[in-house]
């Protein structure tokens, strides 16, 4: 089990519940919870933790993944890269509640947003993994389509 997470995330021990269902070409991209106990706004496009089985990946994944973490949009871009390489991607954040513990308030500005191919990943439970209604939706987000984040995704 390999876990990549932002440095301001406190991992939930329930993350280990994913170990028995890890499989080749499966990526968990988990939305965070804020310190107040609420899931982050727009959980389908806000992930801070990625989990996969240790495995060889296609070289194109390695080349495309050389993007800086912490930029707005990097999480959906990273998940899309794995999805395009044949990975199934799920966001079981309704069972695993990783908490965002930030020492200083930061504002994500669109000037620093990573535009392009994104993967919107609906929130689900561990038991929902594999169900069609929780499959992610790949989209292309050009710079002029910022309203997609405000409109939301209904699944």
Regions found by a protein language model. Give the residues of each.
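Short aromatic/hydrophobic "clamp" motif used to bind/position activated sugar donors
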Residues: 2
């Amino acid at each position: 089990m390999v876990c990549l997470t932002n440095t301001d995330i406190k991992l939930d021990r329930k993350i280990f519940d994913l170990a028995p269902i890890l499989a080749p070409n499966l990526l968990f991209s988990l939305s965070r919870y804020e310190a107040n106990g609420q899931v982050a706004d727009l959980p389908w496009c806000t992930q801070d933790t990625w989990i996969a089985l240790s495995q060889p990946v296609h070289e194109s994944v390695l080349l495309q993944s050389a993007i800086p973490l912490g930029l707005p949009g990097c999480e959906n871009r990273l998940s899309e890269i794995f999805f395009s390489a044949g990975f199934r991607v799920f966001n079981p954040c309704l069972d695993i509640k990783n908490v965002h513990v930030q020492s200083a308030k930061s504002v994500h500005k669109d000037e620093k947003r990573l535009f392009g191919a994104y993967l919107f990943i609906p929130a689900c439970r561990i038991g929902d993994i594999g169900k069609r209604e929780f499959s992610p939706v790949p989209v292309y987000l050009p710079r002029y389509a910022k309203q997609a984040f405000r409109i939301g995704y209904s699944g």
